[in-house]
Amino acid sequence: MENTQVIDWDAEEEEETEISSGSLGYSVEPIGRLRFFSGTHGPERDFPLYLGKNVVGRSPDCSVALPFPSISKQHAVIEISAWNKAPILQDCGSLNGTQIVKPPRVLAPGVSHRLRDQELILFADFPCQYHRLNVPPPLVPRSLLTIEKTPRIRGRSQNSRVLLAEDSEEEGDFPSGRSVANGSRNTASPSATVVPESDEEGSSPGPSVPGPSSPFGLGSDTDESQGQQPGVEESSLADNSGAAGEPEQPEVNGVTTGTLAQPTKDKFKDTKMKEEAGSAGVPVGSVVEGSPTLGEDSDTEADEERQPSGSGDSDTDVEEERVPVKKNQVLLGVGIGGPGARGVAHLQDSPTGSDTDVEEDKTALAAPPERSHTAMVINSDTDEEERGEEEEVSAALTLARLKERGIALWSGEPGTEEVKSQPQVLVERSQSASGRDSDTDVEEGSSGGKREIVPDSPMDVDETLTVTQPESQPPCRPNDVDEDVDMSSPGSHLEGKKASSALVDKNRAQVEEEVPGPSVTLGEKHQVPLEGAQPPEEARETAVQEGSSSPVADIRMSQQPVAEDAGTECAAAVSEQKSALEVGAQSRSPAAPVEQVVVRTDTSGDPTLPQREGAQTPTGREREAHVGGTKHAKECCDEPEDLCLSATQCFVEGESQHPGAVQSLEDEPTQVFPCLPQEPGPSHLSLPTPGADTLDVPWEVLATQPFCLREQTETSEPIDTHEAHGSQPSLPGEPPGHQHPVPTSLDHTELLRIDDREMQTVEKAMGHLSCQMMPDGKASGDDPEPSDHRLFSPVPEASASPQSLLTSQSQKQSTPQPMFPTSSSELALPETLHTKPNVRPRRSSRMTPSPHSSAALKPYTTCPTNQPAASRPTSRPTRGRANRSSTRTPELIVPTGPELQPSTSTEQPGIPNLTSQVTEGRAHSTSVNMPEPVLTGPEAQPLTSAEQSVTSNLNPRAQPLTLEPVPQTSHQRRRRATGKQGSRTAPVGPKSYSTPAEPEPQSSASQSSGASEADSPHQKRPRRQVTQKTVVVKEEDPGEIQVKEEPQETAIPTPGKRKRDPAEGETQGNPTRSRRTKPNQEAAAPKVLFTGVVDSRGERAVLALGGSLASSVNEASHLVTDRIRRTVKFLCAVGKGIPILSLNWLYQSRKAGCFLPPDDYLVTDPEQEKNFSFSLRDSLSRARERRLLEDYEIHVTPGVQPPPPQMGEIISCCGGTVLPSMPHSYKLHRVVITCTEDLPRCAIASRLGLPLLSPEFLLTGVLKQEATPEAFVLSNLEM
């Protein structure tokens, strides 16, 4: 392997370039270019155009950024759907218009025009010419890992348009941008998406990797891509790609970290990513998905091609591709036995089919999963280098994963499917993994349990996959042998790549395991460092923490999950999810995120293999989507992916379960089966690190959350019920202690992915991830395994957002097998939740605002409660996903079952809660479509106990879990019912959580937020769908929001559902906020009016969040513009005192999944405020206190500009009375507004002594909210 991974950096860089064009076909290569002719604005300049949406505008986010006043912020869009198709030019409602020169034609906004080669275009006054570049069709042959192309959603491709601009140039700098760019390119040919060889992948241009990778890396393991989104995208890449690319350390702690095999440039990014990924062991899956996003040039390209949706732009594509991929499930097996327990992350191509294999592999300690973990390790080891490499690896892995997932989806045979998909992924990963022979790296990280593998060389990327193999477990990987082979020898790995199909056949699970494994394992190892209790894992966690400061934070989170084994996993997931959330827009790739990481911890304490399942890829997508969302709110293509996502749910599976059982679960294509052995003291500390990262995403998450809340609320009740039923029945069936933990992990993982993401966001927002993590640590002490689960869960959660639904479905399907590892996992989650309080408030408020969000998020939140720190962040994104996806994915029952079971488990209750939560979040989402009482019971039970324990004490978490699982189940139901009425507080009381209510609420908020945010990225797509459907309505009713939120909370309280717990916490501590925000948001159901800007992306965000577009100022509740301008609408808004907000408010709200509080997004225009000597904030404040012209009667003469009707509108909005005719009597405060031309008309008024004022009395007076007629009297000279 090492030989294979040996990378000649110089050569690789060239290779990278080659690969970007060749391997990916079109991923990195520009499809065309815009040549702007020289003129007064400057010299001639060329802008490359990539697949997807290329936005032309003044905004620096635009692909074609023209920083000139005549160009609108988003002037026009050139969408390239495929390399061989003519680009579509659309004007975005620009101020100065877009014209075709020959024949002369002005493009009306929204009208499409097919560009011909050499066609001349006029953007405002900037002439340019479109040139088509001869780009060879995507090389499908190169992608042994070609994924069955999932329906690529053009919307996604569009989503990436804004990001695209950054992609090529800002790839490194702007992960999200890069992601998008890659994505857009990828979108062009989903089927063409090829997983470049690891070296080549590594070689891919670094820029490609950093941007997208980084954003997606943030997401949790499940949402590897998602995790990668923010900045952890890199990390995710590191996980996925990193796992593949970084030199794998043979099995550190049974988890080998694959160093990114990516080329130098990528390596640099990968390293960075690795750091992030390191913390996001889970992110491996994400990496795979997000990997393209991560944009390792070669990897990313390959990945991108592989998973166009995976990329921010291609989010859609990746997600679509991921949809098939979603079948891939990652089971994160976290060995509870030892901190360094060789948790192996398995990327299961087909959660359903391969799960069994994966589980078996897990049972065997599947080395490949650990290898996957290795990828994570890579992350933490070398911050910069690893990150870069990780990004690359992540990209490669993501691609591979997507492909393998796609294959899994397409393949009918569960085991075979997984193998099949895996081989592709493996190939990609193998390329990465073998290239990275990071086994050593992984071992390095693994040995410490930290798995902070420093991906020394980009070649490590290839090895990443290989690395997955745990040191102790390598032998255990018979199925993984192929993967082992891949990882064992570079040649083998490459061979595996080439023979990926063979590998797949051998053991799709195995391959899957390997692919996802790196991420998870890495996370575990890396995260371990964070936690003191589990040295190896702590080390890993530490690495994660390192990463956490930057995108690594997310990665770290991902990593953490692995490191904590239980706690760390959560944390990692959180960070990843956070990332995903951040990448909210890009998070659109819900489908891709389907890939989930299943945390599997053996009760025996044997290293379990975390297996990344289909959810993870979705996570990556989510991440990407999120990024896209962040970069481009317009990337609404998420919705389609959401749909895909629903298909890609994770199944929760108990480790005790037989491989057969797993398989059956796996049969549900996108289901993740988390198997968590109880491992003491997962490094919860790692969670805090993710928290910090998470804090970055909180607002976005918050914004996304409201929707999640509503939707979740909606789904929450049914799901809760399901959970109760399914979970409870399952509970008895399985050994409470043993099985609960496993399912918990699963559910937890899945939900965590959802919740964690959300949590991440929240935590990011709160900057409290660290706290979360700490509580997690406590939980870890109590329920180490739960912690681990949590961590892993978060990873799944990251994927969960889309996968949340998926998970729900999966769980629904797998309801019968709720062993409820969830209970363990959930237990951990509550702890996390606890830690996450700080994060929670912000997130919570955001999240609560949207009932939909509350419902969906709550379930997710529940997960976070258990895994607040890690889970929550993941939960957020995941939740968002689930939320959006929830409408279409009614298969939450499965999660329900497991959730319930977790409650049974005493120690694992926390975890079960987590799982439950995750499940519930998903279930909730799904609930809308398919309410099943099963979930509710169990969920409520485990959640409450877990949540309470977590809340009151992370340590007690285990015990509360036991206690409250059943009561909570009913309680949750009850709460949901009552909570809906507004007893969010009530949930607080019932839960021991009440004490940590604040933290937990925060956590819950975080989760909700995260879910929302994840939703926004992931949820963005799903949310668009789900939120639009469910959320919108729910969001509309503040009461309902509260109620729904309560239900979510109720759901969250259920012990079975950690997610719910966080939601509950949110409702408890943050409930008021949530409630407050939601009611405002909902009550107001914002009616948004735009002035001076035409922003279809913003309009879509409004609609997706449940608001409406106002036709006039009179019915508007919010005015959106880009600067202070004295337009009639603007002045009317000032006169009425309605918030005048920047476009960023909509973008961030979209990411957060709900309308964020407007106060932070008031338009800022220091120049204009200085010119007119006023403060907009003060003016609005005065206008709200008292109308400026309340006592005034004003007549406006005909010659005044603006014309009298518009002046009359301004006067009315300021409380004045308009006199239709010239007044004939004097009265105080009766004035005439006129101009010099109309002075003759004013003779009577002048004789009466009525003040004759210039229009500035209104225009300036309204702006400053000062009525000073004497200052604007027309002088006698003028008269």
Curated annotation (Swiss-Prot):
It comes from Rattus norvegicus (Rat). There is a cross-link at K1034 (Glycyl lysine isopeptide (Lys-Gly) (interchain with G-Cter in SUMO1)). One of its GO terms (biological process) is DNA damage response. GO terms for molecular function: chromatin-protein adaptor activity; histone reader activity. The keyword Metal-binding does not apply. Histone reader protein required for checkpoint-mediated cell cycle arrest in response to DNA damage within both the S phase and G2/M phases of the cell cycle. Specifically recognizes and binds histone H2AX phosphorylated at 'Ser-139', a marker of DNA damage, serving as a scaffold for the recruitment of DNA repair and signal transduction proteins to discrete foci of DNA damage sites. Also required for downstream events subsequent to the recruitment of these proteins. These include phosphorylation and activation of the ATM, CHEK1 and CHEK2 kinases, and stabilization of TP53/p53 and apoptosis. Residues 2-222 are annotated as: Interaction with the MRN complex. Tandemly repeated BRCT domains are characteristic of proteins involved in DNA damage signaling. In MDC1, these repeats are required for localization to chromatin which flanks sites of DNA damage marked by 'Ser-139' phosphorylation of H2AX. This is Mediator of DNA damage checkpoint protein 1.
